[in-house]
Amino acid sequence: MREFLKDDYDVIVCGGGPVGLATAYRCAKAGKKVLCLEKSVFFNGGGSSGDVVRMLRTMYTEDYMADLAHETLGLWKELGDDAGEGDLVWMTGLLNFGDPNYGAGGPEGTLLGPIPNLERLGMQYKVLTAQEIMEEYPFRNIPSNHQGVFAPDNGVINLPLVLRSLYKLCLQYGCKMVSHAEVKLIKNLSTTMVEIEVEHTDVDQKNKQSFKVKSKKAAITSNSFCNHIIKPSFGWELDMTIWEMTSSYFVAKPGPNATVFKSMWFNFQNDTDNDPTKSNLYYGFPAVPWMTDNHCRIALDAALRQIKDPNDRHDGVETHDVNRTRDWVREHIPGVDDTPLFNVSALMANVYDNMFVLDFIPETNNNVVMFACGWAMKFIPLLGKILSQLLDEGKTQYPIDHFALNRGNGALIIKEGQTPKSVNSQVRAPRYTSMHCKPLTIAKSTVPTNQSSNPDGASSTAPTQSLRSLFASRLLQRSVGMEAKFHSIIAKNRSKRSTKASQKDLTVGIIGAGMAGLYAAMILQDLGLQYNILEANKERVGGRIYTYRFPQNQDKYQTVELGAMRFPKIEIMDRLLNLDKPWSLFSKLEKAGHKIPTIPYHLTVDNNLVYYNGKRIFANTLLNDDPLYFSDTHNGGPGTAVPDKYTYQPYGDLLDAVYKKFSDDLENDFESGFETLLKSDNYSTRAYLFEKGPYPQSVVNYLETMDTGTGLYDMAFSETIMDYFDFSAGDEWLCIDGGTDIIVNSMVKTLRPGCIEQGKVVTKVSRVVGKSGDVSNLKVDFLDGTEGRLFKHVISTGTLASLRRVDLSDLKLSHNKRTAIRSLHYDHSVKIALSFKSRWWEDSKFMNGKPMLGGKSSTDLPVRTIVYPSYGIGQPGVSGVLIVSYTWSLDASRIGSLVGDRPSEEVLIKLCMANLAEVHNVPVATLQQLFVDYKCWDWYNDDYSSGAFALYSPSQFSQLFPSLTKPSPDGRFHLAGEATSVHHGWVIGSLNSAYRSVDHILQVEGLDELRAKLRLNWGFIDEVEDPQDDQQYVDPHHNLSGPNAKKFRSNVSQVAIQPRFKAPRNFKPRNTAASIGGLK
């Protein structure tokens, strides 16, 4: 019987690499009885710990990764001291250099992106020009526009010494170490015990025996080999790809004129010819004291060989990768012999978002924890500490939700018989970047991994990004080129921004009591910050959520939604309505005692009518044979209408043929596909379909008629294609039973009494400059002549059209922001509601056996879309209110010209009644007998909005959107509201933009603890909406004035988006008339 089988254990660690050893050491040091099992021998090079050096780096773009790296620095010293080995890391510093524009979605983030975190953490750095790089380092032929960032708090890990130290410490603290012990199966026996089946091989490799050993807890730390344990034990496997990374050792020139690398270095350049097999990412180490003099490791940060199982590892190294490195050395480091002395390789396990997997195994009662994937060597002491805390306490003091096993809608897990859900990178091996868009500062509180310690139990996991969010991310990332030019400006004011602002003195003025304003107030109140809401409308709050109640009948359903009325149940909308997310608005309101009553919204039903060209069909009618008479054949012959070949198939097939090209391109070559999408922003939908379909204009007009409102194809094609992707998966829709304004009223009830001041029409926002020359407050003036108000920050949440009437000249806004406020396109939308004595459309007899229980009917008549209520269906005596006309764009402009005065509206109602009767094939007189009242609403003629919802024109997304996400030059005036969000046109855009504005305020004021609380209580937004480089931040005449306002000159929240996105594979078919009419 093997000696190690005699006992039960507190912890068994499966995998004896660096992470496993660090975990075993930490647990044993805490007094636990620990067994560490290694399938091979300790110190073997068959996994990821081969070679003699690794990078310890602290330059990260993401806040949370920078914080973890900073925390690890002290733990490396603690580990070295405990082992009695002294320094385990040689702190040489790190030079990052290369193309400052590299990294818009690339695997390494950006060259300049880490600077904000270095400043926030008080870590030194220096920006170098190309000439300075070549003067201080042995590099040559560096392009003149390239730049460098040197940071001293980085170093070379002495890998052999680290492994030896960890092994020695494990033995020192009583951990049993067993090699040639392969874990075959883990069973969870109870809430407090696991059983592990081990195949143990004798030293001579001849005799194998299987045994079982029990433990209270287990850790799987076998990294590339983890699926060999997970799959047989738990019936699923981790969707990971393993890179066979190659590196080479070159001989540097010796002697008095030796080639000396003073530090580690990393070079950022884009791929040659956009070919990922021609990567230009290279890194290197100086010659280290624990190896032969003048031997320097230099390597390509890419891997042509990628495998799924470590047992498929190739013999030798990949010559392609070595030759790429040799070419670069020959070109840029003439003092190094371009023939490698020798080459080495190591395995690097990776998942779709390039981050760690660090979590409890599901359904094991938190008895089994796992770690795998990512570039982890630099975090070894911290990972050992985290894993030991999870094993001992079931929680850790560090925020690790970014590394959760269930992130990405389960994209990491492949169950038996399933195909992978994620898309792994194909060539490049990202070293230190994540797909998550919002960082989380290390919280001082203890946070369990399966639930949060805050009252709401909110998870900080960043949501999966939609294509629309990815598009915005890319636009924001492209504005980093001038980053280094204003570091000197930041440094001049650094001392002024070194202390935290007083929360007591921090006041926020919110202009507008719509969804964005109310949501911002809820967040600020939760964070303990002062705020006031200034609403222009004396009659109501809620902005473009407007539930009108007809006065004649007071029953529950005598209502009509003149604004937002339906919500798709898709991941994008989680922040609004997902009750499974404790940070969603509906969850917050329910916890406050205001449950939002949702019911299904019927977007379309089979009996809905489609009436075009005088032809009436039902929504479930197939569109294969031109039933609506759009074809040349039905209109007098060739050239009279639409060519037959286009009309004798579902119109959706014609659109899908174009849109699917984007799906295929993004799947097959993300970078190329995304470039195509970016370029498409310059097109209108009409122009793109005409040029790229290519479809004749008659066909484009036909598609627009069937697909959406008249004139909407003149808007940006990028809007069309992103909606197509984002909403393709949405089958379920919701509405609010009793009126959407229940959301608004519930939000108001959660706020402190008296915080909303109605009738406050803002006329001017200006700066108040203190004695120091910094902007100390913003002053808000009002139309009623009352005394202006002072606030530290102002969030404007109304429409940009209404903001246009406010004097902002003193704020010195950027040109692009002023242009956006003036010219950003808002769509026109009109709703006309009719109240009847009864719901005749639900009466089977009245409708000849075809009642309509919700949904919509579509027509080419002026009313265009008729919407039947989804609430109160089938209930006796319920009010008969329907939307007789819901129009957008040109249709809305024309019908809206009759909205306003009573005589015009009487003409309009007669027209609507006639159209309604014609669509439903009933006499107008019959409907007149049932008619009670009407309500018309034109959002363009509304005094307080002057537009329905933002819908960008060609190029506006790429040209104007980035400026809308930034505050004013002093960091105190913030734009929110749906138009400033990537999800404009939807309530979720209002919520996300409000979150972003509050986050910016916390950044400017240096309130990092409140930023952690924000993420803890309110989760993350799925948008990359952090402020980026803009001309407004370069102006040296405007000093930023908050303790942390420097961030707004250089904070680039980079997102490497390639592996994060998966194009939809199965779009909903549009082969029946039910699809006609669009969504908005």
Curated annotation (Swiss-Prot):
EC annotation from Swiss-Prot or TrEMBL: 1.5.3.1, 1.5.3.7, 1.4.3.2
Compartments where found: Membrane
Keyword Oxidoreductase part of the UniProt annotation: yes
Region described as Disordered: 445-464
Binding of FAD, residues: 10-40, 535, 544, 563-564, 978, 987-990
Gene3D superfamilies to which the protein is assigned, alphabetical: 1.10.10.1620, 3.90.660.10, D-Amino Acid Oxidase, subunit A, domain 2, FAD/NAD(P)-binding domain, Guanine Nucleotide Dissociation Inhibitor, domain 1
Annotated stretches, region: Putative sarcosine oxidase: 1-450
Transmembrane segments: 508-528
GO terms for biological process, alphabetical: amino acid catabolic process
Cofactors (names): FAD
Pfam entry (one): Amino_oxidase
InterPro entries found in the cross-reference section: Amino_oxidase, FAD-dep_OxRdtase, FAD/NAD-bd_sf, Flavin_monoamine_oxidase
UniProt binding sites for substrate: 886
Known catalytic reactions: sarcosine + O2 + H2O = formaldehyde + glycine + H2O2; L-pipecolate + O2 = L-1-piperideine-6-carboxylate + H2O2 + H(+); an L-alpha-amino acid + O2 + H2O = a 2-oxocarboxylate + H2O2 + NH4(+)
Keyword match Glycosyltransferase: no
Membrane topology recorded in Swiss-Prot or TrEMBL: Single-pass membrane protein
Positions of the UniProt region annotated as Putative L-amino-acid oxidase: 450-1080
Record key words, sorted: FAD, Flavoprotein, Membrane, Multifunctional enzyme, Oxidoreductase, Transmembrane, Transmembrane helix
Gene Ontology cellular component list: membrane
Major enzyme class: oxidoreductase
Family statement drawn from the similarity comment of this UniProt entry: In the N-terminal section; belongs to the MSOX/MTOX family. In the C-terminal section; belongs to the flavin monoamine oxidase family.
PANTHER family assigned: AMINE OXIDASE, FLAVIN MONOAMINE OXIDASE
Task of the protein: Catalyzes an oxidative deamination of predominantly hydrophobic and aromatic L-amino acids. Metabolizes sarcosine, L-pipecolic acid and L-proline.
Record protein name field: Putative bifunctional amine oxidase DDB_G0291301
